[in-house]
Amino acid sequence: LSALPQLRKAAPDARIIMASTLTAAGATQTVKALALGASDFIAKPQAGAFGSVDTYRRELIDKIVALGERAATRSLLSASSVPIKLRPKPMVTTQPAALLIAASTGGPTALPAFLAPIARRIEAPILIVQHMPASFTPVFAEKLEAAIGKHCREAQEGDTLSSGTVLLAPGDKHMRIARCPAGRMVHLDQGEPVNYCRPAADPLFETAAAAFGSRLLCVVLTGMGHDGRAGAGKIVEAGGRVIVQDEATSVVWGMPGAVAQAGYAEAVKPLKELSQLALRMMMGEAA
């Protein structure tokens, strides 16, 4: 860890992947590494676990390729060469009843930066999916709470969504939303991975669209793959609003790019601008 700041200083554009053990200590070190500038992390193969080494090899190659492609295109701003058709802003807007956020690669750095300026001003529940193993999410929830100045914890089965709630999907469990007599509540399950992920954004987005209808704001931040694209489509169908991080400020423009290229996003913004836009939208402004 002590070498990371020096590495970043010597090679600011370097992509660093942290290999971590699936332990509490490993999770703490990994979250620190991400805060110090590591681009992503990968869990070390578990001794004796069937297929563990093969899974590790495949995931490592995928991450190297994704980060390498991003590094190669950063200076070219390739997003500008990909036509993005933004959704028109709605003529009439209602104040969202919940804020949904999804992130993967780059998310442990992007999420605190996105939420710190605005979280305390948002009364509605904030629900977050960050692709992480089960041993990592409790540590990340604590770090996120310290960064944003608002209580944040892992979601639990049966949680009722109330004002001021900030819930992080636990590792290895999908977080879904359902209506209940008290309003809306959380359901957790270990269903099949979606888009190779558990937790995944799509189950949250799709069930929240059914539970909240049009009163949703969905934000998709930096991440590899296309998790969140199908769910963003459901949110749009229900009348909700979707905004995404731009390529220039994303570590990997997979998830937000997939949503934007599908035509579901009404705004594609740099991270700082996206944060302020989300705040205005959560306050009920047309933005």
Could you tell me what each predicted segment is?
Residues 1-287:
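Conserved acid/base catalytic micro-environments in cytosolic active-site loops
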